[in-house]
């Protein structure tokens, strides 16, 4: 057999595998975990919300991203987050938050620099180990008795210096916007991405659960509250908290949707283009 033919074939094979290895290393992996159904139609649509985010990320980023969506609760396989650049949790929280019994599993990923984003109810965990973990990993959490969860219209005040806001149009959206998070002491290392000023009706607790009022919330009338925030951790990973997305139809708002998609991509370590992640408006 011609030695030159063998040599050329060998070089071609090495080149092929090298190309695919480089390509694989260029792909950013994002894992979504969607919680079990807990509300009526249109609210806490965790499965639908994660699938929408997945499809719109692929629309905007194409082969730059690999996505996995685990539906209806915490994944049961042994190593669900292998090689993930970001984990996005969109699920019911509080005492029944799945992260409470899976802290070590998540910590293993965090310690290697994996990003973590918690959305809506997923920012709520009990005081103690889970609360401290979220403060470390994403900068803060919803603390029962301290935070509040009313339904109100937020008029966006965006931190235009942050990449998550790139290309995002200002918006006015009614949602169950949680606020007064229990952030790290002095809000150390926490960057506000989206703020808004709740009206006094929102602060009254009439639409929150449990019903208000809470003295410290009412007395802060007129104060802007942080609804989306970010951290860049010492381990190299990133964290984001986003308190909206109670109502699925809010993904139909261009500014709201782009902010969320930018946040997911930023959490995974991707560079956000100046116009943000551009996708079509879904019919919801």
Task: Locate predicted features.
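Positively charged n-region of N-terminal signal peptides that target proteins for export
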Residues: 1-5
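Sec/Tat signal peptide C-region and signal peptidase I cleavage site
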Residues: 19-24
């Amino acid at each position: 057999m011609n030695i030159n033919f063998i040599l050329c074939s060998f070089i071609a094979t090495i080149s092929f595998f090298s190309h695919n290895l480089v390509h694989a290393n260029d792909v950013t992996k994002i894992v979504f975990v969607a919680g079990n159904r807990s509300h009526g139609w249109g609210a806490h649509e965790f499965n639908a919300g994660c699938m929408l985010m997945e499809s719109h990320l692929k629309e905007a980023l194409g082969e730059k991203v690999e996505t996995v969506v685990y539906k209806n609760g915490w994944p049961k396989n042994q190593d669900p987050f292998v090689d993930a650049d970001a984990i996005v949790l969109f699920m019911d929280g509080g005492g029944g938050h799945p992260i409470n019994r899976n802290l070590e599993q998540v910590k293993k990923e965090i310690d290697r620099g994996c990003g973590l984003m918690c959305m809506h109810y997923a920012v709520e965990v009990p005081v103690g180990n889970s609360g401290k973990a979220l403060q470390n990993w994403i900068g803060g959490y919803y603390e029962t008795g301290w935070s509040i969860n009313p339904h109100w219209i937020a008029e966006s005040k965006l931190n235009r210096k942050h990449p998550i806001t790139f290309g995002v149009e200002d918006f006015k959206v009614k949602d169950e916007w949680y606020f007064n998070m229990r952030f790290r002491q002095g809000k150390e290392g926490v960057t506000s991405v989206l703020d808004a000023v709740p009206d006094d009706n929102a602060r009254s607790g009439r639409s929150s659960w449990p019903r208000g009022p809470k003295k410290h919330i009412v007395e802060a009338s007129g104060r802007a509250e942080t609804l989306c925030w970010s951290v860049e951790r010492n381990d190299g990973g990133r964290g984001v908290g986003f308190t909206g997305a109670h109502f699925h139809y809010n993904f139909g708002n261009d500014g709201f949707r782009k902010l969320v998609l930018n946040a997911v991509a930023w959490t995974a370590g991707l560079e956000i283009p100046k116009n943000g992640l551009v996708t079509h408006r879904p019919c919801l």
